[in-house]
Amino acid sequence: MIREERLLKVLRAPHVSEKASTAMEKSNTIVLKVAKDATKAEIKAAVQKLFEVEVEVVNTLVVKGKVKRHGQRIGRRSDWKKAYVTLKEGQNLDFVGGAE
């Protein structure tokens, strides 16, 4: 069993984009920003416990940080991890419903 403190640190924020909205409508998938060291099992457990929904599958990827300029200096944004969480049939979780 994963400790509750760890579950709270795994999920960072919902990732709101046009692609994420389409995924939610078509395949009942939510997109989340998660901790870089989070595993699929931790993400699944955190979503099920915190949002009280049934998770079917979790897919993850690491988004590489962009190179950005600030004046003459060149910097780089940090890499971050994104999780596509597919909910079971009949389950619903709406992050952007009130944003319209």
Curated annotation (Swiss-Prot):
Ribosomal protein listed as a keyword: yes
Domain of life: Bacteria
Keyword Ribosomal protein: yes
Molecular function (Gene Ontology), one example: rRNA binding
GO annotation, cellular component aspect: cytoplasm; cytosolic large ribosomal subunit
An example Gene Ontology biological process: ribosomal large subunit assembly
Swiss-Prot/TrEMBL keywords: Ribonucleoprotein, Ribosomal protein, RNA-binding, rRNA-binding
Family: Belongs to the universal ribosomal protein uL23 family.
Assembly and binders: Part of the 50S ribosomal subunit. Contacts protein L29 and trigger factor. Might also contact SecE and probably does contact SecG and SecY when the SecYEG translocation complex is docked with the ribosome.
NCBIfam families referenced in this protein's UniProt entry, alphabetically: PRK05738.1-1, PRK05738.1-3, PRK05738.2-4
Function comment: One of the early assembly proteins, it binds 23S rRNA; is essential for growth. One of the proteins that surround the polypeptide exit tunnel on the outside of the subunit. Acts as the docking site for trigger factor for Ffh binding to the ribosome (SRP54) and to nascent polypeptide chains.
Protein name: Large ribosomal subunit protein uL23
Native source species: Escherichia coli (strain K12)
